[in-house]
Amino acid sequence: YCVATTCVFFIVGLPDFHRIDKRYLYFGIPTANLSSLTFCLAIFTSSGGAQTMEVGMVNYLWPSLTILFAVLFNGVRTRWWLYPGLLVAFGGIIVILSGDKGFSVTEFVARFAENPVSYLLALVAAVTWAGYSSMTRAWGKGINPSTIIFAVDTLLFLVLWLLDIGAQPVAASAHGLMSVIFGGIAVGMAYVVWTLGMSKGNITVLAAASYFTPVLSCVFATFWIGAELNSSFWMGVVLVVVGSLLCWDATGRGMKKFRKAT
């Protein structure tokens, strides 16, 4: 987060606090911090293995919630097949994250009953991120507060570290340092671009495209840590693509241009 904060500072700098809507300053920005904090605590409190995967899956409700909030609170017009598209795309996420073992509702309920806090924290993280995105559209006025968000996140995680909450430090290595540097830069730039997109772009298209996040993560993992992509991954990719295209068409913009071109 220190790397990300530095990166974001050099990209967008500090916002003009006099121009920031007070609602965005006191509610929007803290909501983004709450999302980061609750997601990290959700992963920390999970028991690992299948439960960590399921917690991540719950958190991936945020693209769907972002679109839902855009329809409810930001006046975005859509069509009925947006909702089947959301279900198909989220189903693809489940298939990708579950892997060859598949997803069992019974086992999911059992693990939730054992450790509901972790799952609820992941849900809060998803809701708050969607809320931050909606508030950015409504109150952001084109101002990008990513530097402030990351600076506060860094302080929060420093406090957690001082309280001995989190993973134990590992020995430094060239590979680890590269992961920290490139990971921090990637996360920082993602925040900057996402906030800009929420301010001025097509919310539903951006949120639908976000379903490709775990897809790209898996592809990157094959190069960075040598992970293997199984058949369930590609099946999930197909579902994500189909669902995202349905969401795109439901906005009433993308497919109109496509039909005119053809």
Residue spans for each PLM region:
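C-terminal-most transmembrane helix of multi-pass membrane proteins
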Residues: 1-2, 176, 211-262
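Hydrophobic alpha-helical transmembrane segments of multi-pass integral membrane proteins
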Residues: 1-11, 26, 85-91, 117-124, ...
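Specific transmembrane alpha-helical segments of multi-pass solute transporters/efflux pumps
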Residues: 13-53, 95, 183-201
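Juxtamembrane helix-entry segments on the extracytoplasmic side of multipass membrane proteins
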Residues: 17-22, 98-125, 163-181, 228-238
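Glycine-/small-residue-enriched transmembrane alpha-helix faces in small-molecule transporters
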Residues: 38, 86-87, 91, 100, ...
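Specific alpha-helical transmembrane segments that line the substrate/conduction pathway
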Residues: 40-75, 203-223
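Hydrophobic/aromatic residues within transmembrane alpha-helices
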Residues: 42, 72-78, 139, 145, ...
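Loop-to-transmembrane alpha-helix entry segments
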Residues: 56-59, 75-95, 116-118, 174, ...
